[in-house]
Amino acid sequence: MLAPKKVKFRKWQKGRLRGPALRGISIAYGDIALKSTEHGKLTSQQIEAARIAMMRHIKRGGKVWIRVFPDHPITAKPLETRQGSGKGSPVGWCAPVKPGRILYEIKGVNIDLAREALIRAAHKLPVKTVIVLKERL
């Protein structure tokens, strides 16, 4: 699963997602992409599950690019623990996502096959998404 090698702080504040995405909003590598239409946080497990669903559908052809990286730590307190006594320990990583952010790109396969693969990946994600095609000049 995806995780950063080194971070400046072990625990971060949750923060808040506001407004549309300003970067990562255009297709850079592939021909067809999956774009987020709402705010949310994708965990590394969700990102990996969507990748596996796509790869199983397109088999050996084509290339897939993951355009988000989980670099925000998620903390949790143990079960049956009273509140207080500090912040919980890190349990995983997530990628904050804003509307308009490109999540995955595919190239090298039939558009219909790629579209079906992206639909399968979208079912694994907690945010609403749309499929977009690269504009030809």
UniProtKB/Swiss-Prot annotation:
CDD domains xref list: Ribosomal_L16_L10e
PROSITE patterns: RIBOSOMAL_L16_1
Recorded superkingdom: Bacteria
GO MF entries: rRNA binding; structural constituent of ribosome; tRNA binding
Pfam families: Ribosomal_L16 (PF00252)
InterPro entries: Ribosomal_uL16, Ribosomal_uL16_bact-type, Ribosomal_uL16_CS, Ribosomal_uL16_dom, Ribosomal_uL16_sf
Function: Binds 23S rRNA and is also seen to make contacts with the A and possibly P site tRNAs.
UniProt name for this protein: Large ribosomal subunit protein uL16
Lineage of the species this protein comes from: Bacteria, Pseudomonadati, Thermodesulfobacteriota, Desulfovibrionia, Desulfovibrionales
